[in-house]
């Protein structure tokens, strides 16, 4: 009986682990950590300048992605694959 229970526990843990998805920081009204949708296993941080760059700094976008986005003119993009590996630069200063 104990062997059966132990086997069920091990199988359950293995099944739960197979469904694991990455967690990334995401920008919106505020910066939050969210579980990425299935298939989006990378976190990214994209920065660029807009017309207010001189007064407020670069625009920063954080989120999940399936593949690292293509860099466009005047953008900087970094991608990573561990949980919450894309913190906002101001979060790193704490």
From Swiss-Prot:
Cystine crosslinks: 24-43, 36-64, 49-53, 68-79, 80-85
A GO molecular-function descriptor: toxin activity
GO cellular component: a single term: extracellular region
Keywords, in A-Z order: Acetylcholine receptor inhibiting toxin, Disulfide bond, Ion channel impairing toxin, Neurotoxin, Postsynaptic neurotoxin, Secreted, Signal, Toxin
Domain of life the protein comes from: Eukaryota
Tissue-wise expression: Expressed by the venom gland.
Subcellular localization, as worded in the UniProt entry: Secreted
Main subcellular location of this protein, as a coarse class: secreted
Annotated InterPro entries: Snake_3FTx (IPR003571), Snake_toxin-like_sf (IPR045860), Snake_toxin_con_site (IPR018354), Toxin_cobra-type (IPR054131)
UniProt signal peptide: 1-21
Recorded coiled-coil stretches: none
Free-text function comment from the UniProt entry: Binds with high affinity to muscular (alpha-1/CHRNA1) and neuronal (alpha-7/CHRNA7) nicotinic acetylcholine receptor (nAChR) and inhibits acetylcholine from binding to the receptor, thereby impairing neuromuscular and neuronal transmission.
Protein family: Belongs to the three-finger toxin family. Long-chain subfamily. Type II alpha-neurotoxin sub-subfamily.
Protein name: Long neurotoxin LNTX37
Source organism of the structure: Ophiophagus hannah (King cobra)
